[in-house]
Every structure is written in C-alpha cells, then in structure tokens.
Amino acid sequence: MATVASKQSQNSMLSNIWGWITTVDHKRIGILYGVTAFVMFLVAGIEAGIMRWQLSMPGLDVVSPDVYNQMFTMHGTTMVFFAIMPLNAAFFNYIIPLAIGARDVAFPRLNAFSYWTFLAAVLFMNFGFVVGAVPDGGWFAYAPLSEQPYSTNQGMEFWSIGLMLAAVSSAVAGLNFIVTIVNLRAPGMSLMRMPVFIWMSFVVQILLAFAIPVIAVGLIELTMDRLFGTVFFKPSAGGDPILWQHLFWIFGHPEVYILILPPMGIISDVLPAFSKKPLFGYPFIVFSGIAIGLMGWAVWSHHMFTVGLGPIAVSVFTITTMLIAVPTGVKIFNWIGTLWGGSIEYKTPMLFAVGFIAMFIIGGLSGVSHAVAPSDYQQQDTYYIIAHIHYVLFGGAILGIFSGIYFWFPKVTGKLLNEKLGKYHFWITFVGMNLTFFPMHYLGMNGMPRRIYTYATEYGWDNLNALSSFGYVILFIAMVIFIVNVITSLKSGEDAGHDPWNAPGLEWTIASPPPVYNFSDLPVVEGRDPYWIIKRRAIAEGKELPGPQALVDPSTVHLPDPSYWPAFTSLGLLIFATGFMIEIPVWFVKYPIAIVGGLLVFVGILAWSNEPITREKNH
C-alpha cells in the first residue's frame, strides 16, 4: 500500500509540474514571473553584497579586480533586466486581465512563450558562472571595452545574446498586453475609466514596442563584432563606439520609465484604497504618465554630456532633462492631493506607497541636477550617479513593487501577509536603503568614481563606505523578514476574503484566489472605481454589501487549453543561443548546434500555429 501511495504521490507531483510547464493561464504565468524575478532580485542583492564587502574598508582584497567587475556587471544587468522588469511583468500578467474584467490575455500561448523565453535568458546569461566566463564589461557594456581584446573570454557573448533572448520575451509580451488592453476591457470600461495601473502598463507596453528594437540592433552589432569580426564599434577599423552609447541610451532612458511607470500605477491604485477617497486628479495623472512616456525619448544624451557632443546638443538635452520633471511633479502633487483629507489607514501597502513618494522625490531631485551640464561633468561616472539611480530604482521601483505585493498578495493566495512583520519589513528597508545609498551622494561629490574595486585611506572615503556597507546589512535583514513573512503567511496566514482592503477595482469583486476563468459573468463598468459604485449603491438601497461572484463549473466557460509548444519553442531558442557559444566546424557550418536550435524553433512555431486553441469539449 505504501508503494502504491508513493507512486501516486510521484505521479501527482509530475502532473503538477507538467501543469505548470504547459499552463497558459495568465495567473500562473504571473506567479512564475514573480517567483523567478524575486529569486533573481536576491541573486542581484548577493552580488551587491560582495561589492559592498569589498568596499567597506580601504585596501581590502575580498575579491580580485576581475571578479569585482563581474559582480558589478551582473548586479546591474540582473537587477534591471531580470528582477525589476519581470517583477513588473508579474503584475502585468496577474493583474491586468483581472483589473479590466477579462478572462485571460489576448494571446495566452504567446504569454507562456514570453515567460519561458525570459527564463531561457536568465539561465543562459548566468551559465557564465558555471563555465567561468562571467560578463565583465559593465551593465551598459560600453564599446570598445566590451569588444575583443579588452574582454577576452565569452562573458560578453553571454551578456549580449542573453539580453537578445530577454528582448524577444519583452517584445512579444508588450504586443500581447497592448492588444489585451485595447480589445478585452469589460463593457463600459472606456479608456478614461481604466485604473491608473492599467494606463501606466499600457504606456510601458508601447515604450517596449519601440525601445526593444533599438537595443536589439546594438546587441546584434556587438555580437557580430565579437563572433564574426565586424567592426561596428572598433574605432581602429573605422567603427564608432559613440554609436553604441547612442543606441544603448536611446533604449536606456525609456527603460528607466519602463521600470518606474508600473510602480507609479501601483501606488495610484493603493493610495485611494487606503485613503478611502477617489484618486485626486485622475486625468492629470494619466496624461502626465503619457507625457513621461513621450518625453523619455528626448533626454538620452544627458548620459553623454562628457562625450563631446557640442554646446547645442548639450543645451537641448539640458532643457529636455529639466522639462521631464514637470509631469513627474504633477503626479507627486496629485498623490499628495489624494492623501489630503482622506481617512488614511497606514497598512503595509500604504507605508510602502508613501515611502515610494518620499524616496522618488529625492531620486528625482538628484536626477534634475544632471540637467546642469557643468555640474554633470563633475557627477559623471561618480558615486553620485549610483546614489541617484538607486533612489529611483530601489527607493522608487522596489518600494512600489513591495506596495503592490502586499496589496495584491491576498488576491493571489487568499491569505493576508502578517501586518506586524510587514511593518518591520518596511521600516527596516526604509532605514537600510537610506543608510546604504544616501552617503553615496557625498562619496560622489568627494570624487569617488564608479567601478573601482578598492581605494586608499588618504581619499577620506572610508567612513561613508563603511556606513553604506552597514546599510546593506540592514537591507539584508529586511529581506529575510519579508521571506519569513511570505512563508509563514502561506502556511498559516489569516484568510483574506475577497476584498480585504475595501478597494475599488474589479479584481476585488471575485474570489481570492481567483477561479481559473476569473469572471463567471463579465462585469459591466459604470464609472471609475467600479466596485465602490456597486457598494455605495447597495448601502444607499439598504442592502448587504455584495460578496464575490458566484463560482461556476470551469468546464462551462470557454478557456484555452494548456500547450507545451511555447516552452518547446523557448527551449529551441535557448539551444540556438547556446550554439553560438560552441564552435564545432562541420563541413562549411561553424555553429551546427545553433542550426539545430533554429530547426527546433521552426518546428515549435509550426506545431504551435497548427494546434487548436481549445478542444471541442470546451466550446
């Protein structure tokens, strides 16, 4: 009997794993994105810890200069492309269909392909640690330092090809969500009735659609320089390294808004829920988000003031860098207006949202200072820049993401995160990040350059570096508290119910966690804050507050069937990418494994396109 039970348990586990591999359910894909991205967030944090350990005192030899360059490169790359972006994607996947009243995204299998290709990119780039070829050219990979002979191993191939895989994932996801938001909104949900999170997500998908091709061109050219001997960025052979900087930053500055706009949308949903009043200045927040998306294309060269662009170019980008602060300021004043006069409840999601506002103001002010070209010459490539980007991406994006995690965790799991541990997490994070990053402003103004692995006592940077490294320890403790909170809450947390925050969005009208079909009956939206409208009507009519939608038999709802072809196609892409790292000349073919991978991709696409979306039983 024990043997039979063991086999049944193994079969059940294998069936469950296969279910996750073949899933096309946006909610499961959102969870996959979130878990993978959080693991990579921790990996990036460990890489940062190694750097802070090395810099905690003058003259330390914790790691070699080569390893320090690898940690520096992988920390930035991982945090930007494999942590913050996919954490945002986790919210896109899970929340967008729920918040617009849809049963899934427009292209469920393409959604699955996006995740598996993202995972392929993560595995491919980090495989460099296994084979001793870790990228070491900086997360921005400035050519020609990222070219041969300055970076001699295969690390930068892992970097450039890995990011091309990530670019494929982001591009198809962006197009998928554009179609989803345009076509699958519930009846009555006009554009100006959409939640701000949906608006900011929509702007981000459009930014991705235009920004990804730019960096893809640069990555292809860099890879061709390294693998096939082209000279796009080699000045000794007529190439232009400044071309790489333009390509990278034309993508890179919209990328900043790709990272920060979703958390802005998150807190625009959190603040009204915990202020018990509608969002102040909804149209201004929406149009300021659109303005940020448009103006983000006009500021890239403030990263390049020391390149020698000339006074006219510097003057133009100085002006645009100042102007982009205006729509951001509009958002901040509207968020403050939402708080003003509200019945504020300082639950953990609200604390992280308010913390986001405070920290993003500091990051924004240090960013606007880059518009002063003469002082930017002094700030360029110093720790002042490190401080600025971390106040924007940690104080902004990460705090906003944690606000969203605490806000929607009950919807995803049906359990509330522990409020006491959550507040400990917030306050320790808040103190830790300021101890870590605020001293970097002074280090930069005192002349400490980025990317150095050690320094002499005579420079006077030791005390501030020690304080910054101590702040990292505080942040580490905060992350441990968060992980403990998640694990214990999943095991024995308080049941959340369907609407624990008395929130206004459509996602709170259904059970927690949501059924596989989301909505048994598609909702009809009568205005902004649709669930508040329903609840107020019930109160006015003397009725009980409405509960969640009634559950129905999933077999009666039209849903797409699982498919393994998206994962198969992504595996083909991974083999295709790996093939360029292994040179095995066969006849006239230099990279036969890449050809095998390409054939697998072709087979996957062909089979995918001929697979019916649903079987007859689900019609």
Question: Where would I find each of the regions flagged by the language model?
Answer:
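Membrane-embedded and interfacial regions of multi-pass energy-transducing membrane proteins
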Residues: 2-619
